[in-house]
Amino acid sequence: MADKILIVDDSIDNRKLLLKTLGKGDYILLEAADGKEALARAFEFLPDLVLLDVMMPELDGYQVCEALKQDPRTADIPVIFLSAKAETQDKIKGLDTGGVDYITKPFDRGEVLARVRTQLRIRNLMKELIDKQKRLDEDLRAAAVIQMSLLPQSLPTLKEIDIAWKFIPCELIGGDIFNVVLLDENHLGFYMVDVSGHGVPAAMVTVSVSQVLQPHSGYLKKKSDSPPYYKIISPKMVLEALDREYPLERFGKFFTMVYLILNIRTGKLIYSSAGHPPTVLLHPQRPLDLLSQGGTIIGLGGVIPFKEEEKVLSKGDKLIFYTDGVVDFQNQHGESYGEERFLALLRSLEDQPLELILDGVCESLTAFGHQARVQDDVTLLGMEFKDIS
C-alpha cells in the first residue's frame, strides 16, 4: 500500500514544487494551505509523513507539530519541517517540538526525496517492530495463562494434613510450578520446580515437566505384577529419570526441583532435592530443620548423584517449600531479602496457622521491597501434619 504524505505550506508555489518532486514516487499526496487545514487533514487521513512549513499565519508549524504530537492518533507520524530559516536554534526548536528532520528552502529535489525516503523507511520499520512486539506480548500473555493453568486447581483434602500455597508472578513469565499429588490412600507426593530463565521457552519446559509429573505418566508410580499392582517411585529415582529426560543440550534449560513423599498415616517422609532451596521443617518449640539432601540441578547428566533422606513428622510439624524468588528478591537499594531473614521470619511465625505463615512471608516481602515488583516468581507451598491416629 502506498505511503500517504501530507504537504503543508501557505505558498501554493512551494506546494506545487513539492507535489512535482514527489509525484513520480509511489506516494499518495495530500495538501493543506495552513495550520488549521493541516490538522483537519491529518486527523482525517492519518498520513505516514508530514512535510510542514514553519512560517504560516494563525498556527505556525511548531504549533501544528505540538498539536499532532499531543493527539494519540497522530503522535507517531513523523514531521519534517520546511523553512527558509537555517539557523541552528530554529532547527533545535523544530526537533524539540517533535520534528524528525529539517529541510531548508529553497528545496533541493534530491535532498527532499532522500529525506522523505529515509523517514518513511524508519516509520515502516517502526511499524514492523511494533507489530512484532504486539505478537510477542500476545505470546507472553498466552504463556502466562498457561503458567497459571498449571497451578493446583484443587488439592487433596485430608484430615491428617493442612495445605496452603501462595504464588506471586513476576512481570516476565517465569518457570515455577508445584503440586501435591495423591499417590495412593496412604501417600502424598509434593513437588516444586523452578525452570531457569523467563518467557515462552521457560514456560514450554514448565508445561512439559508438569505433564511428566502426572500420577498416570509412569514417572511417579508404575504398574506392578503383584499386589497392590503398582509401585511408588522413590524421589531419588524420579530425579534421575527427569535428569535423563531433560538434558541441558536438548532444551537449553535446566531446572531445580524438590520431590517429597509423605506417608500420611505414619508421618514418615522421604525426599530428594535437585539443587532446589532447602525445604524448611518447622517443629513446635524446637529448632527448625533444613531438608537439603539431594544432588545437582536437573539437566547436567547426573554430575553429582542424587541422595535421599528420611524424616518422621510429629503432630504440629510444618513443611515450607519455596523457590529462590523469595530469598533473591531485591529492594530498591539492591539488597536481597536473603535466607537468614526468611528463616528468622519463619521461626517467629511457627506457631501460627499455615495460611497466616505464608501471608506473613508475602507481607514481609512487600514491606522489604517498598512495593517494588518481584524480579522472579515468588512461590510458597506449606503443609502442616496434624494427626497420626
Indicate residue ranges for each PLM-predicted region.
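Active-site beta3 strand of CheY-like receiver
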Residues: 45-54
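… and, occasionally, acidic/histidine-rich disordered N-termini of signaling adaptors
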Residues: 128-320, 370-389
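Helix N-cap/capping motif at the beta->alpha junctions
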Residues: 31-40, 61
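Receiver (REC) domain active-site loop signature in two-component systems and cognate sites
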Residues: 56, 68
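Active-site residues of response regulator receiver
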Residues: 9, 53, 83
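C-terminal catalytic subdomain
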Residues: 312-321, 326-389
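Two-component/phosphorelay signaling modules centered on CheY-like receiver
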Residues: 3-4, 12-30, 40, 44
